Amino acid sequence: MAQTFFFYDLETSGLNPRQDRIMQFAGQRTDMDLQPIGEPYNILVTLNDDTLPSPDALMVTGITPQKTVEEGYAEAQFARMLSEEIFTPDTIAVGFNNIRFDDEFIRHLFWRNFYDPYEWTWKDGRSRWDLLDVVRLTRALRPEGIEWPIDDKGEPSNRLELITKANGIEHENAHDALADVTALIAVTKLIKQNQPQMYDYLLKMRDKKLVQKLVNVDDKKPFVYASGRYDKEFAKTTVAFPLTTSRNG
């Protein structure tokens, strides 16, 4: 089976994947040339009566508990859809900060509904890719051909809505999951068109075995590393050096 991307985004009732819940899910499958396959998904998920969204979530998304009850799928039904229709074999799940945020909500969703919480990101040719780190490394190392935004404080910013605005990409209704997915695909195309070698290299580096060859305590060499822990002054990127393994190996 040919590999495909599935770009997705969530709107949630809060920031804690253990306690909070998914309210909106949107996604679009594409081929490896980023051309759409089929229709996009844009669905609400019913919040249980014991889930109280944070005020910030309500203000940012505009999604109320009442709306999820009226229009949403039951969480168990949604989990089945993800498992059987969306995160199918040979799917590369793609998001923006998904490894640290969205993927954790999906894992906890599967766990609550008696699905394996990890297989959807590795089994049968599946994998995942976080475009936030791709954006960080492209900005730091291969910025040519792309307009990189500055926020209202005069500091570099990699917020999706600012990148789209700086590059003339339509992105109305930021923080609506489907609008964010459409914008993310457009930004991915922008990077692929302007920095194809960087794009191809970083796509390959979603494979942890290739990363392990770079970050190898038995053959120590410096490597370039991007992370939100680093300062904006250095484009969230640094040169790191492996010293020892963590207790997790």
Description of each model-found segment:
Residues 1, 86-88, 247-248:
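Flexible, charged surface loops at secondary-structure boundaries
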Residues 1-4, 209:
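N-terminal accessory regions of nucleic-acid-interacting proteins
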Residues 7-9:
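Short hydrophobic beta-strand that contains or immediately precedes a catalytic carboxylate
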Residues 11-18:
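Short acidic, Gly/Ser-rich segments with clustered Asp/Glu that frequently serve as metal-coordination loops
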Residues 14, 81-85:
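A generic secondary-structure signal
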Residues 60-81:
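Metal-dependent phosphoesterase signature
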